[in-house]
Amino acid sequence: MESMGRQDRRLHQQLKESSSRFQTLMKRLIAKYNQPFEDDPLVEMRTLTYETPQGLRVWGGKLMKKEDKEYTQVIDRLNGQAPEGDSESSGADTSLEENWPSCSSAMREASGDPRQRQPAVPGNTLETDLRRKYLTQVDILPQDEEYFKNAEKRGGKDTVMTWVPSVTSSVTPASGCQDAISAKSSGGPEVSALSSRGQGPSYPCPADMAIVARSDGLSLLGTSSNSVSSQSFEVDDLCNVTISDLYEGMMHSMSRLLRSKPSCIISTKTYINQSWKLRRRPSRKQGLHKNRTHCPRSKPSQRSARKGPASCSEPGKEAGILRDYGNLLHVAPHKTGLELKSVSLEGSKRQVHKSSPAWKELQMMPQKDLDLNRERENRVMTLQWLISPVKVVPRPRMLPSQVEKWYREIKIKFDKLHQEYCLSSGKQPRLTDPTESWAVDVYRSGSKSPGSRQDVETCRPSSPFGREKTERPGEALEDLRGNGKSVKTKSCLLRSCPSPEGSPSRSPSHSQLSSGLQEHNSEPTGKAVWPSTAISAPSIGSPGCGKDNYYELKKEFNRLYQKYCLSPQRAKVTSCGRVSPMKAAAALPCQSEHLKRLNPDSPQQSSQKRSISPGCHRRVLQDSTAQTASTLVRDSWLPTKRCKLSYPVACAHQAKFHDTSGASGWP
């Protein structure tokens, strides 16, 4: 116990020394900076006045002229100086009674003076108004936070105060004696005084008096356990105050002092907490939230009573779903697979609102809570995006109007190219013909994955642009599997017919495409037949070999589809091998004769007429063996892989087309 008491005394002594050092430093700082900086005015805190070239001016008030003797006397009295005529004839007590009648009566009442029942003499009204307007209670700074809480609860009502002599000259008087005053003598009972409202006009207090709340557990500095009015303050009691005891009251008083200037308000802790509230942000999309129900603001007690974690969680989720569903209007339909219409969306919302039982609870839920939850989610997502090392930037979404405009432009360009292609080849454009070009069907078949089943079915349209039913090339390619069956490949690739063997009018792109179909297998089998012909030849090889040939054909077909149809930007390529087959064939005399034989009106006749040349046809009829058919396919149908020097006419024609009109790929 003795050791504990010794430690407490040592700690108490150290605290006193620390407090004394702090006060010494503070006094030095005050003495150092208690002067104007450069041209700044020096404001007297007791009178809130400062000197100007025009005269004496009150802080936040009007100018006090030098000729005005009445104002000058008021300022002299506030500074503790008596007027020149009264300084010699009157003493301290007389001046106190004349200038501060209410304060002197309160002191006589506290000391038991028989003159306490004498009526108070009205003082100067100008002096009272000046103090009431421009002075603040700086002497209540040492009080604890309970004093300010009680002051806020009172709301300006009369409070019980105690008169004590001022400790230092820097303590500023209070705003007056308009409050009720009670005094406590050193040995007598407590005596109460009437309110100043019943006595008449209130009078300010002198500069050497301070007001503190009457409490036995509080001292002027907040740490003394004895009564304030029963003891005189000693130097040791001054060492107990700390800056934490003074800070909150100091900020409160300075805020009240500088409240006339909005830019000079000093924010306290309470003010900061009240100001930092989440404010509602205006919605960017005003047209999409017309169905929201806004509830009127209620009192804080009612709003807190309505908040229920269990009842408000589900409606909040549904509200988020509704908002997200409404925000899907700007997403393109081909990306989401949903056809969102404005009329159907409004109708579905009405049905959801009528059928959902939680919608009634959602209507009663304040809109502010929904916005707070949404804002909190957005902040969490933003924080996660900032923390994550990989920044995934979302692509800008295209509005439905932009998508439709994009498709419309592509369609116009494609139709224009198709018309030019048909006119250059001497044909009329027929977009409804089932035997139209393979590129037209691919364009109308919609966006499919390159490796899917729909990719092979290029002649079967799957989008609303065209609904024609044609044979699938995949079904024709499946006939390669069986032995003894005829290989009948019907496609919409090209309407040109190849020339007989040895003819120099074969298109280079014709040979390039055929070589691409045969570049992975060099066996003497009839695995690759030009799609624009219809010949009958028995298949040679085992079923497994036919299956392998089928998959190789399918792979090459997909590669050509990706190369020429999925990239419309490559329509004009300056390559010699990518000249349009129809343009090249239209320029050649041999091909023009075959084009005259074709009839685009009847697909069956055109498919029958699009056969090989007479010489080749007689050769196929005469040779019925598999070796002859394979030799026919290998020798007369499929040319070499590259355009060699043995075809000077075709290469020269390609160079001519490249120089005049530019080489263009397939549409």
Swiss-Prot record:
There is a cross-link at residue 554 (Glycyl lysine isopeptide (Lys-Gly) (interchain with G-Cter in SUMO2)). Residues 496-515 have a biased composition (Low complexity). The modification Phosphoserine is found at residues 169, 185, 195, 388, 424, 449, 462, 567, 613. GO terms for biological process: CENP-A containing chromatin assembly; chromosome segregation. Residues 78-126, 181-201, 279-317, 443-530, 596-617 are annotated as: Disordered. GO terms for molecular function: DNA binding; histone binding. Residues 601-611 have a biased composition (Polar residues). Keywords: Cell cycle, Centromere, Chaperone, Chromosome, DNA-binding, Isopeptide bond, Nucleus, Phosphoprotein, Ubl conjugation. It is found in: Nucleus, Nucleolus; Chromosome, Centromere. One of its GO terms (cellular component) is chromosome, centromeric region. Residues 466-482 have a biased composition (Basic and acidic residues). It comes from the Eukaryota. Residues 279-297 have a biased composition (Basic residues). Interacts with CENPA (via CATD domain); the interaction is direct and specific for CENPA since it does not interact with H3.1- or H3.3-containing nucleosomes. Heterotrimer composed of HJURP, CENPA and histone H4, where HJURP interacts with the dimer formed by CENPA and histone H4 and prevents tetramerization of CENPA and H4. Identified in a centromere complex containing histones H2A, H2B and H4, and at least CENPA, CENPB, CENPC, CENPT, CENPN, HJURP, SUPT16H, SSRP1 and RSF1. Interacts with 14-3-3 family members in a phosphorylation-dependent manner. Interacts with MSH5 and NBN. Centromeric protein that plays a central role in the incorporation and maintenance of histone H3-like variant CENPA at centromeres. Acts as a specific chaperone for CENPA and is required for the incorporation of newly synthesized CENPA molecules into nucleosomes at replicated centromeres. Prevents CENPA-H4 tetramerization and prevents premature DNA binding by the CENPA-H4 tetramer. Directly binds Holliday junctions. This is Holliday junction recognition protein. The lineage of its organism: Eukaryota, Metazoa, Chordata, Craniata, Vertebrata. The gene is Hjurp.
